[in-house]
């Protein structure tokens, strides 16, 4: 049996193909999928989906760093509502920092980074109050993510770095803090030997696998829908 710790089912729901996707997952011995929230655009959808597909799925809610804008505080105020539902989220995420595509204008870039950091800190505080694990999105921002988590005194035992893309050095830092890591299909890409080395250095009891569906299909289906 398999457990997909991180996927995004919205695209399949939008094109009315979700029933087929879940059926194929079940046929492939995928016991359960966690569909991960990224913004207001999918939180309510996922809460509704688990009402129908609760045996096969759980969900999370969180504000992805790429969707953090000037109104992020208002959006985060609605997060608590989901923990009042009959089927509450199993984690808060995905949250974190993404410095991969910042504005070229220095002032705008600094503003985006500041928004992301403040939203990240706030969501860690919310997760701490709710006693929930967090799913971390970190792209070109590993050092900054670790620093903010450390400064927040958040329980590292409840931290999952999703789609891990760093090296053995960073894995050892997470191991030392008792955090978790999750690997995707990019592990199979030829250029990612550093990831395979990192996998070998991961504490087995802290290792998770994910599809990040519909993204990041492994070899030989790289570039296609996952």
Show which residues each predicted segment covers.
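Mid-domain alpha/beta scaffold segments of enzyme catalytic cores
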Residues: 1-226
